[in-house]
């Protein structure tokens, strides 16, 4: 398995939830599906709550925000999200001072990380009390750490030419992207996305949790060969880390 060597630790909690530790030792979460996540290792259900500084939210589907409100209340972590999700979270009892809402193209600094919100082509709704609630639009993030290491989390999305622009503008070292198919891009689309982005490393996510998510890291690697992509694919199992 690759060693990043950049003093940033990235752990797959399961499905689309990731835990990152910054060079300063700050802990951040990308999406928050923990307690009911069928592939989350039991020790991580407590560990994600330890010294949690921030939670970055890509969109409002249950498999990305099921534990968001509880974690924010318990830990006091700053919640970073697309602007139109803020009123819903305030209504759930998260103080305005704990919320950082912004939009595509904007950049904020939270927990020593400069985060730029990017486009993701996906929906962002939840179903509560017999109603569909719109929680803004889906997003991705470019996360730039204090030592220059840069991670691009695409969010749930299909492949898009925006990824080429992001690759040219931000030169991400590592990409986190979905490969499961059905609700997001499949391994072949993801391989083409990696061709557009040009990062050194990639971590696949959002596959295998349910039978309908049929994409595999092996298929991603195969299609990377098809497109001449040299990005190294790091296939983490839930609970595994790379640093």
From Swiss-Prot:
Pfam families: Lactamase_B_2 (PF12706). InterPro entries: Metallo-B-lactamas, RibonucZ/Hydroxyglut_hydro, UPF0173, UPF0173_UPF0282_UlaG_hydrolase. The keyword Transport does not apply. GO terms for molecular function: hydrolase activity. Keywords: Hydrolase. Gene3D superfamilies: Ribonuclease Z/Hydroxyacylglutathione hydrolase-like. SMART domains: Lactamase_B. PANTHER family: UPF0173 METAL-DEPENDENT HYDROLASE MJ1163, UPF0173 METAL-DEPENDENT HYDROLASE MJ1163-RELATED. Belongs to the UPF0173 family. NCBIfam families: PRK00685.1. HAMAP family: UPF0173. This is UPF0173 metal-dependent hydrolase Caur_2542. It comes from Chloroflexus aurantiacus (strain ATCC 29366 / DSM 635 / J-10-fl).
């Amino acid at each position: 398995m690759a060693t990043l060597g950049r003093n940033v630790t990235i752990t797959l909690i399961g499905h689309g939830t990731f835990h990152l530790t910054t060079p300063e030792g700050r802990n951040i979460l990308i999406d928050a599906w923990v307690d009911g996540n069928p592939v989350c290792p039991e020790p991580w259900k407590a560990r994600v709550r330890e010294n949690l500084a921030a939670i970055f939210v890509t969109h409002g589907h249950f498999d990305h925000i099921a534990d968001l409100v509880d974690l924010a209340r318990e830990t006091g972590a700053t919640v970073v999200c697309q602007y139109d999700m803020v009123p819903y979270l305030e209504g759930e009892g998260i103080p305005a001072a704990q919320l950082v809402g912004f939009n595509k193209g904007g950049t904020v600094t939270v927990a020593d990380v400069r985060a730029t919100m990017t486009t993701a082509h996906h929906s962002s709704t939840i179903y509560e009390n017999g109603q569909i609630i719109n929680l803004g639009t889906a997003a991705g993030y470019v996360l730039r750490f204090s030592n220059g290491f840069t991670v691009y989390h695409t969010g749930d999305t299909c492949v898009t030419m925006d990824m080429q622009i992001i690759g040219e503008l931000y030169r991400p070292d590592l990409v986190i992207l979905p490969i499961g198919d059905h609700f997001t891009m499949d391994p072949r689309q993801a391989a083409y996305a990696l061709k557009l982005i040009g990062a050194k490393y990639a971590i696949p996510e959002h596959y295998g949790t349910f039978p309908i998510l049929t994409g595999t890291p092996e298929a991603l690697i195969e299609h990377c060969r098809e497109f001449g992509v040299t990005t190294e694919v790091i296939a983490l199992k839930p609970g595994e880390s790379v640093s």
